[in-house]
């Protein structure tokens, strides 16, 4: 620090820089690393945080179509609940991609729960109108398996770092400025993935953890992105 100002240091460069360490961020980091890319994953708190690893429960429930014939109904239900705000292409990608994604997680060795005890098979998902296929990712197992895989693939983990700004050059994002509270660092990248979650904790009454504060949306907006589908879910 000089004259009351922090110096900006070049920390590192990589092919893919991932901001956020929930399920989306972890999945992006693993997929990029498996393709041969060098990956840095940055998270404000600890690894495995946010709503994906909500501390008030044992795991994360995953809802999908009961079978192929149920896909159209689930797509329609999501779009109806979304009151016209849902992107049809993204809805279809979710519905058609959820089972392959679940199988990939299972093949990695992560323990998944199935509905079947105490009337669980009779439960209807929130905002839905019928029974669907349900699987639950057990957090303890996910942390163990994902940590091992991230290490095997050589993903660099920078936890306890706050992202302050996305850096642009020639009309594209080329890196980010982060801080550990004592120093400023620039991380350069060829591609950047924002997986920082939602913004539910900005509201006085919310169910999510305090780190779900809209950081990614603010960074993206400042970098010139257009925000869509901004409605609170937690």
What is each of the regions a protein language model found here?
Residues 1-16, 34:
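Extreme N-terminal leader/targeting segments of oxidoreductases
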Residues 11-14, 182-191:
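Core beta-strand elements of the Rossmann-like FAD/NAD(P) dinucleotide-binding domain
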Residues 191-234:
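Glycine-rich loop(s) and the adjacent beta-strand/alpha-helix scaffold that form part
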Residues 34-37, 59-63, 208-214:
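A glycine- and small-aliphatic-rich helix-loop capping segment at beta-alpha/alpha-beta transitions
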